[in-house]
């Protein structure tokens, strides 16, 4: 069964209801009814006349609902009455269907104080409705409801009660029980609160412990990290200290080694200086000149071998001084004396040190006296404390000596003379060969016999003035060879080529040229006296011998390197009767201690220093000699194994000219001034070596065997 519906006209229903309940509104009633054939409630009418006007609008054929506001005089507020109108002509089915709608309609219209059921106008009484509103029976004002109430009152029973007498024990138990549970509840709540607090405290304590543990772990890590850093720093400091100590030790070792090296170098320098000083002292103190012996042996060998066998002194090989008794590949067949002698052990055959043999015993005293008188100057003694000798190494001294020797150069040679002069030389050479062959036949005891027979000669003027560099082995210019060869008799012509390389070792070019003019005549006279067997030949005038012509581009000949501090000028070997008393080079006996008395040697020093010629006269003599030269491009045997020309040799001499000139500038003051030095760009080809031991030990054995 369907219920009443308010949805279709809900706004109209509520608007009419609001008009009734609002005090400001004039309307005080509203009538609602169903739509035709449906249960939808709608507004039928509204007005301001109260219950009387409302009762006039009810219809007998419809079910209607009236809502009215009734004002009571005793009440301040109005009352609201809901009238349920069921007309007499309404079907019963409709009445039964709408009976259940009253409660929903009263609920929809809130504030209904009294519900009045009416089917006619007489049921709508204003006095009855007001009475009911005043005593509270307004609900029962309906006759139907009144009858129903009366029927209920008749059937009602007496009302019972639940009251009981209060029992103190029971009441106390009940109260105690309630208090107990309340206390238990409170205790439980307190316990739970304590447990919560304990859990919170435990959690806080755990957090604190965890934080403390983390802090301790962090501190421990930091401590270990600091310890590790300290260890690393200590290790680094130790490593740095070790490195510093190692560096100091290395520096100390290096300094020690450096000091040792410096000490060794200093000791080596002192040793070399002491050797130089010792050698200089020995050279300065010796009264004889060992090189004289070898020069005389060369002359003897060249004289014994003949002029055809003697190699020209200008047919040389560079780097090696000329020596007739040294067999060379480019020289002619050697003589018997030179073939039997052994070559020198050093590349400098003329350089000797402390063991220089004293070979004066191989010659008679007469020859020794003639050598001493013909020597230009004695050996200049140089103090071992001389700074130029003691503090300078051997190589520098040799170089300076070479520079001093080559500081002066001769003028260029004139063109060679006509070949007519060659014929003049052939006869003296043949005579010299015969005389030297006779010298081989002479016995050894005759050497010492001549010493007693030959008286010393008084103050014969020396040929040449020596210079401080006479110990150096050098080769003179062609005019020096002529100076040594021109005063000799016919027998000396055979060795003029050899004398060109050997007789001029101790003198420079300028010194020889200046002393040549004044010494030719006295030297010739003294040589004539020395050769008694050839007096007739010496009395006759003799043409000047032929001198080899140097190359056109050369200005001076090669200088052979001699020892330092030797100053004796080599005289020509006598080839007269004394040649028979001379022994062969292989048959010479052991030489005596000295060549001659040092007193006699010292007597010739002032004469040698005083006899110095002027430059113009020396140059004129040199020009006359050079005009007679015929041989083309001679060569000299030098310290090497190959030949070199005089131009190259001259360049080698000029290479050392500057330093030698500076060192020996003061020593050249007593000598004649030389031409200015000539410098060359080509380095020297002379093999300069340090002082060596005795270069001819095998020849000494040969001398002993000859005895």
Swiss-Prot record:
The modification N-acetylalanine is found at residue 2. Residues 355-364, 380-395, 639-652 have a biased composition (Polar residues). InterPro entries: ADF-H (IPR002108), ADF-H/Gelsolin-like_dom_sf (IPR029006). It is found in: Cytoplasm; Cell projection, Dendrite; Cytoplasm, Cell cortex; Cell junction. Residues 209-438, 452-497, 531-557, 582-609, 630-707 are annotated as: Disordered. One of its GO terms (cellular component) is membrane. GO terms for biological process: actin filament organization; cell communication by chemical coupling; cell communication by electrical coupling; cellular response to transforming growth factor beta stimulus; cellular response to tumor necrosis factor; cellular response to X-ray; generation of neurons; in utero embryonic development. The keyword Transmembrane does not apply. Residues 329-343 have a biased composition (Low complexity). ISGylated. SUPFAM superfamilies: Actin depolymerizing proteins. GO terms for molecular function: actin filament binding; cytoskeletal motor inhibitor activity; cytoskeletal protein binding; profilin binding; protein sequestering activity. Residues 409-420 have a biased composition (Pro residues). Residues 209-236, 288-298, 428-438 have a biased composition (Basic and acidic residues). Brain neurons. The modification Phosphothreonine is found at residues 377, 381, 392, 549. Residues 695-707 have a biased composition (Acidic residues). Actin cytoskeleton-organizing protein that plays a role in the formation of cell projections. Required for actin polymerization at immunological synapses (IS) and for the recruitment of the chemokine receptor CXCR4 to IS. Plays a role in dendritic spine morphogenesis and organization, including the localization of the dopamine receptor DRD1 to the dendritic spines. Involved in memory-related synaptic plasticity in the hippocampus. Drebrins are classified into two forms of the embryonic type (E1 and E2) and one form of the adult type (A). The time course of their appearance are different from each other. Their structures are closely related. Adult rat brain expresses only drebrin A while drebrin E1 or E2 is observed in immature animals. Interacts with RUFY. Interacts with CXCR4; this interaction is enhanced by antigenic stimulation. Interacts (via ADF-H domain) with ZMYND8 (via N-terminus); the interaction leads to sequestering of ZMYND8 in the cytoplasm. This is Drebrin. The gene is Dbn1.
């Amino acid at each position: 069964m369907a219920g009443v519906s308010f949805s279709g006209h809900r706004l109209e229903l509520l608007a009419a209801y609001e008009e009734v309940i609002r005090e400001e509104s004039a309307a005080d009633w509203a009538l609602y009814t169903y739509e035709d054939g449906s249960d939808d409630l709608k507004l039928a009418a509204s007005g301001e006349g109260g219950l009387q006007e409302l009762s006039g609008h009810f219809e007998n054929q419809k079910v209607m609902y009236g809502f009215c506001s009734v004002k009571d005089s005793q009440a301040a507020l109005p009352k609201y009455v809901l009238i349920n109108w069921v007309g007499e002509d309404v079907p019963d089915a409709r009445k039964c269907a709408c009976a259940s709608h009253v409660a929903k309609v009263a609920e929809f219209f809130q504030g209904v104080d009294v519900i009045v059921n009416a089917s006619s106008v007489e049921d709508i009484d204003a006095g009855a409705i007001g009475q009911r509103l005043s005593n509270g029976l307004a609900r029962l004002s309906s006759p139907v409801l009144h009858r129903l109430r009366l029927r209920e009152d008749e059937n009602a029973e007496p009302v019972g009660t639940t009251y009981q007498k209060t029992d103190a024990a029971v009441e106390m138990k009940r109260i105690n029980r309630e208090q107990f549970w309340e206390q238990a509840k409170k205790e439980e709540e307190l316990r739970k609160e304590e447990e919560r607090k304990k859990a919170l405290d435990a959690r806080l304590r755990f957090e604190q412990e965890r934080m403390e543990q983390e802090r301790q772990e962090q501190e421990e890590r930091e401590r270990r990290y600091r310890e590790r850093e300290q260890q690393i720093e200590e290790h680094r400091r130790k490593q740095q200290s070790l490195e510093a100590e190692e560096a100091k030790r290395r520096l100390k070792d290096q300094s020690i080694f450096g000091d040792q090296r410096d000490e060794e170098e200093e000791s080596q320098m002192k040793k070399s200086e002491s050797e130089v000083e010792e050698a200089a002292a020995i050279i300065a103190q010796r009264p004889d000149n060992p090189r004289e012996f070898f020069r005389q042996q060369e002359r003897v060998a060249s004289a014994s071998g003949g002029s055809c066998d003697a190699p020209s002194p200008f047919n040389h090989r560079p780097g090696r001084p000329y020596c007739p008794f040294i067999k060379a590949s480019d020289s002619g067949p050697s003589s018997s004396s030179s073939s039997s002698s052994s070559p020198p052990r050093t590349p400098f055959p003329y350089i000797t040190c402390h063991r220089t043999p004293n070979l004066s015993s191989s010659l008679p005293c007469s020859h020794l006296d003639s050598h001493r008188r013909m020597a230009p100057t004695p050996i200049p003694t140089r103090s071992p404390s001389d700074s130029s000798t003691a503090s300078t190494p051997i190589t520098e001294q040799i170089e300076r000596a070479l520079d001093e020797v080559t500081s002066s150069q001769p003028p260029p040679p004139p063109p060679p003379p006509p070949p007519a002069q060659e014929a003049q030389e052939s006869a003296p050479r043949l005579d010299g060969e015969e005389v030297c062959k006779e010298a081989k036949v002479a016995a050894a005891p005759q050497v010492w016999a001549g010493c007693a027979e030959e008286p010393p000669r008084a103050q014969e003027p020396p040929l040449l003035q020596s210079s401080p560099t006479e110990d150096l082995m050098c080769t003179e210019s062609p005019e020096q060879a002529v100076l040594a060869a021109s005063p000799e008799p016919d027998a000396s012509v055979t060795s003029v080529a050899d004398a060109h390389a050997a007789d001029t070792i101790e003198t420079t070019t300028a010194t020889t040229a200046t002393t040549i003019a004044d010494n030719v005549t006295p030297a010739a006279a003294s040589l004539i006296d020395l050769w008694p067997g050839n007096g007739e030949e010496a009395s006759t005038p003799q043409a000047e011998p032929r001198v080899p012509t140097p190359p056109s581009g050369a200005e001076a000949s090669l200088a052979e390197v001699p020892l330092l501090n030797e100053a004796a000028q080599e005289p020509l070997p006598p080839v007269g009767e004394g040649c028979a008393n001379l022994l062969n080079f292989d048959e010479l006996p052991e030489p005596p201690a000295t060549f001659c008395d040092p007193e006699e040697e010292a007597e010739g020093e002032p004469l040698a220093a005083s006899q110095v010629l002027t430059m113009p006269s020396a140059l004129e003599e040199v020009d006359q000699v050079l005009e007679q030269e015929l041989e083309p491009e001679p060569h000299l045997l030098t310290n090497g194994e190959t030949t070199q020309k005089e131009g190259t040799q001259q360049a080698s001499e000029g290479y050392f000219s500057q330093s030698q000139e500076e060192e020996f500038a003061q020593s050249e003051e007593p000598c004649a001034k030389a031409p200015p030095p000539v410098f060359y760009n080509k380095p020297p080809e002379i093999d300069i070596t340090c002082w060596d031991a005795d270069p001819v030990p095998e020849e000494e054995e040969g001398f002993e065997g000859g005895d």
